[in-house]
Amino acid sequence: MVAGSPKTSKKTLPDLSYEDRIEGVVFGVDEVGRGPLAGPVMAGAVYLHREHIPEGINDSKKLTARRRHLLSDMLHNQADYATGMADVHEIDRINIRQASLLAMKRAVEALIQKIGREPDCILVDGRDIPDWPWPSLPIIKGDSLSLSIAAASIVAKVERDEIMVKASQEYPGYGWEHNMGYPTKEHREAIQRLKPTKFHRRSFSPIRQFYENVD
């Protein structure tokens, strides 16, 4: 683990304070989709190039869908990134925490393969670090502090949303095209009315309770 962290501030946007303390190649990693009742958990890994950093990068949750798509397109052209996913079956088998870490590891491995070198440090959103050999620094609320992590949250969110919108066409009625699988009132009521799909997480309470009541 890499020691040390910049002092906290009242800044409104993430910056390179953490990245500037580290020499060499720095990846930012974040995941999205821990809370939904349906769909995969997705992680992004981003290597920003200092001379080409899009303006306006922020925690994906603080951006509109339109802004996220715009920034994702810009990152596609101006940075190196990759995504990793753990599907519903993996979530149910190993639990959502472990599945999130697995998705992060897959994203990092994909980015290493893409750029042809390993990172000197990985900045990870949250408290947990996946089981990998690279020096890492966990940062609580990292997607609001580190540009690299914020960028990772954007690419992961955009890709996961696209998966959910596509899935909503196969399984209409659950509102996935706008709730992205999260437990909204509409989604919960649809589960009771239409029954869960193979895209739902059976280990999550509302889905598990549905099958317990059926049995």
From Swiss-Prot:
Record keywords, A-Z: Cytoplasm, Endonuclease, Hydrolase, Manganese, Metal-binding, Nuclease
Cofactor entry: Mn(2+); Mg(2+)
Recorded coiled-coil stretches: none
PROSITE patterns: RNASE_H_2
Described purpose of this protein according to its UniProt entry: Endonuclease that specifically degrades the RNA of RNA-DNA hybrids.
HAMAP family: RNase_HII_B
Protein name: Ribonuclease HII
